[in-house]
Each structure stands twice: as structure tokens, then as C-alpha cells.
Swiss-Prot record:
Keywords: Early protein. Residues 49-72 are annotated as: Disordered. This is Uncharacterized 19.0 kDa early protein. It comes from Human adenovirus B serotype 7 (HAdV-7).
Length: 173
């Protein structure tokens, strides 16, 4: 259990009723803000120095979210966010707060390009920062040259704007 705890408490503010069951967690230790939205926000308490999205003393605990958000809060509750409660993609070091928020509450524009980039980079060699919304065409043309791949990436942004990454399956690519 010690490996699941970060070096400082993370606070997770949630307004959806089904998520309030986290209040029963014995890890409650830090107050956090809540805003009138269905978005799930991450913020730190307190804010430590970080390096590349990882805690400076996390050891083998793995990466944790380090982004913060300042929001107007009317109510507050407290709870420590354990790694098991973080979506798997959100635990990638390059995954930002805004991308995690879009993934937590999927919308028409909620595809996480960073998450796909970390997965696709191993297959195509695309750097994660420049990887767009991946379609099945990208995998077959990535080895045909940079110019060809760029065209595929440009068109793929127009093709996949409705399905969040978390609801798409590899079989459909």
C-alpha cells in the first residue's frame, strides 16, 4: 500500500454524484476545490518542485500528476488521489492537466493526442509532440517518408473528431 501513496497528497475535486463515493476513502488528508461543472480537476496540495511531470522523490512509485488549476470554489472536500484512481493514460509524464480533464469527461473534441502519441511512437517513430489524432492510415504510411506521413496526420485530424480515444478500440483502427 505504501507504493501507491505519492510523496504528498493530491486533491481531486469532483462534482459528479457517482464519484463522491471516493469520500469514503481513508486516505483523506487535503482540502480541494469543487466547481459547478462535470469536469474532474487535479490540483496539488502543496505544490512541490517537479521535473518532467514526475515528483522529484517519487522513486519507484511512478509518475504522478503535477499540474495545478486555480478555480473558483464554493464548496470543498478532501481526499488523496491514489494512482489506482488515475486513468492509465493520465499517468504518462507528458500527459497534461487539460488533456486529463478532457479524457475524464469525453466530448466531441476530447481525443487525447498525447496519449495516442506515447503509444503510437513505438510503432511509427513519430515524436509525441507532433503526433495528431491517429487513424489507421497513419500506421500503414508512416514508413513512406516524412512528407507523406505529415499529409496523413493533417487529414486524420479532420476524420476523427467525434470519438474519444477511450471509447475507440484497436480493432476499429
Amino acid at each position: 500500500m505504501a507504493l501507491m501513496r505519492s510523496s504528498w497528497p493530491l486533491r481531486l475535486s469532483i462534482t459528479e454524484q457517482r464519484s463522491l463515493s471516493l469520500l469514503k476513502s481513508p486516505e483523506i488528508s487535503c482540502p480541494g476545490p469543487v466547481r459547478s461543472s462535470s469536469m474532474m480537476l487535479l490540483s496539488l496540495c502543496p505544490i512541490p518542485p517537479t521535473r518532467s511531470g514526475r515528483t522529484s522523490n517519487s522513486g519507484n512509485r511512478g509518475p504522478v500528476m503535477t499540474s495545478t488549476s486555480s478555480i473558483n470554489s464554493s464548496k470543498s472536500w478532501s481526499g488523496t488521489l491514489l494512482p489506482s484512481l488515475i486513468p492509465r493514460c493520465a499517468m504518462q509524464p507528458k500527459h497534461t492537466l487539460s488533456q486529463w480533464r478532457r479524457d475524464a469527461v469525453p466530448t466531441r473534441q476530447s481525443i487525447s493526442s498525447t496519449c495516442w502519441a506515447l503509444t503510437v511512437q513505438k510503432k511509427t517513430g513519430f515524436p509525441s509532440k507532433s503526433t495528431g489524432r491517429i487513424t489507421k492510415n497513419t500506421f500503414s504510411t508512416a514508413s513512406c517518408g516524412k512528407r507523406k506521413a505529415n499529409r496523413v496526420m493533417t487529414s486524420s485530424r479532420k476524420l476523427s473528431t467525434t470519438v474519444p480515444w477511450m471509447y475507440s478500440s484497436p480493432q476499429s483502427w
